[in-house]
Amino acid sequence: MAEGGYEDRELEELRRKKLEELQKKAELERQAQIAAAQRRIALKKILTPAALARLDNIRVVRPELAEALEQQLIALASSGRVRVPIDEDTLKEILEAVYSQSKREYRFRL
């Protein structure tokens, strides 16, 4: 019977650890959702509806580029380096700058 008690404690410890992992994961997901909602609110304030629609289209095709662009837009607007609201043409210019920074260059030697 002593072995059964040991196995029960071990099983309970495994369950407790798994529960902690799930709780941590849920908390991280919740924080990510809050951050995304805050970014969305900021973007709605600094972009025209047409520019926001273009950003949404970019997000569908290139999510990593859209995220970099969002960060750049929020930084530019908060520092006052760009006029708010940002229209679609200005967004295109910023997009070109961000895209050229994020584009990877590959070199092949033959």
Curated annotation (Swiss-Prot):
Please list which residues make up the signal peptide: none
What Pfam families has UniProt attached to this entry?
dsDNA_bind
Q: Which GO terms describe its cellular component?
A: cytosol
**Keyword vocabulary terms for this entry:** DNA-binding
Source species, domain of life: Archaea
Cite the GO molecular-function annotations of the record: DNA binding
The reply to whether Lyase figures as a keyword in the UniProt entry is no
| Protein family membership | Belongs to the PDCD5 family.
The cross-references to NCBIfam families, in alphabetical order and at most eight, read: PRK04239.1
Descriptive protein name: DNA-binding protein Tneu_1679
Q: What is the lineage of its organism?
A: Archaea, Thermoproteota, Thermoprotei, Thermoproteales, Thermoproteaceae
